[in-house]
Amino acid sequence: MYKVLAGVGSIVRTLWMVFTHITRKRDTILYPEVPAEEIVPPRYRGRIVLTRDPDGEERCVACNLCAVACPVGCISLQKAEKEDGRWYPEFFRINFSRCIFCGMCEEACPTTAIQMTPDFELGEYVRQDLVYEKENLLISGPGKYPDYNFYRVAGMAIDGKEKGQAQKESAPIDVRSLLP
C-alpha cells in the first residue's frame, strides 16, 4: 500500500512541476525566431570590415600594423602607391577560420579603416570560403566614425590647400627663427 501511495504521490508531484513550469519564461533563446539585436551584447566583436572615409575613398593606408598586431597572423596585405603618393592595399586578406575576434587589429589601425561589426553569422561549409578578400571586406560607408578622415588630420598635403590650411592643422613653424 505504501508503494502505491508513493507512486501516486510521485506522479502528482511530477505533474504539478510540469504545469507550474509551462507558464514560466524560457531560458533558452530560439535564435532564428529572435532578432539578432536581442541576442548580441552591445560591444560584441564580430565580423571585420574595411571602411571608407567621408570622401568615399578607402581608409586603409597599408601600414601593416593590423597584420603585426594580430596574435594568430590571419591578416595579410600588400602595399601599393597611387600617383599622388597615397598608399593603399593592393590586396587585403583575412582568414576568418583562424581569426579569434580579439579586436587587436581594430585597436592598432591608425586610420580606423578596420572595424568590428556585431555580425556573427560567419558559418560556411567550405573552409576556403572563410578567406575574405578586400572586395568582400570593403563597405560603402564610414562605419563607427563618420567624420574622421586620416589625411585631414595626418598633415599630408591636400590639393588646393597649402601646408597649415587643412582642418585642425597649425601653420608650419620656422625652426631657425627659434634659435638664439
UniProtKB/Swiss-Prot annotation:
Main location: membrane
Subcellular location: Cell inner membrane
Topological relation to the membrane, as annotated: Peripheral membrane protein
Cofactor(s) the protein needs: [4Fe-4S] cluster
Domain 4Fe-4S ferredoxin-type: 50-80, 90-119
Cellular component, GO annotation: plasma membrane
GO BP annotations listed: aerobic respiration
Binding of [4Fe-4S] cluster 1, residues: C60, C63, C66, C109
Cofactor: how and how many bound: Binds 2 [4Fe-4S] clusters per subunit.
SUPFAM superfamilies cross-referenced by the UniProt entry: 4Fe-4S ferredoxins
EC number, UniProt record: 7.1.1.-
Positions of [4Fe-4S] cluster 2 binding: C70, C99, C102, C105
Assigned keywords, A-Z: 4Fe-4S, Cell inner membrane, Cell membrane, Iron, Iron-sulfur, Membrane, Metal-binding, NAD, Quinone, Repeat, Translocase, Ubiquinone
Molecular function terms, GO-annotated: 4 iron, 4 sulfur cluster binding; iron ion binding; NADH:ubiquinone reductase (non-electrogenic) activity; quinone binding
InterPro entries associated with the record: 4Fe4S_Fe-S-bd, 4Fe4S_Fe_S_CS, NADH_quinone_OxRdtase_chainI
Cited Pfam families: Fer4_7 (PF12838)
Reaction equations catalysed: a quinone + NADH + 5 H(+)(in) = a quinol + NAD(+) + 4 H(+)(out)
Keyword Ribonucleoprotein among record annotations: no
NCBIfam families: NuoI (TIGR01971), PRK05888.1-1 (NF004536)
Protein family per UniProt: Belongs to the complex I 23 kDa subunit family.
Function: NDH-1 shuttles electrons from NADH, via FMN and iron-sulfur (Fe-S) centers, to quinones in the respiratory chain. The immediate electron acceptor for the enzyme in this species is believed to be ubiquinone. Couples the redox reaction to proton translocation (for every two electrons transferred, four hydrogen ions are translocated across the cytoplasmic membrane), and thus conserves the redox energy in a proton gradient.
Subunit annotation: NDH-1 is composed of 14 different subunits. Subunits NuoA, H, J, K, L, M, N constitute the membrane sector of the complex.
Protein name: NADH-quinone oxidoreductase subunit I
Taxonomic lineage of the native organism: Bacteria, Pseudomonadati, Pseudomonadota, Gammaproteobacteria, Moraxellales
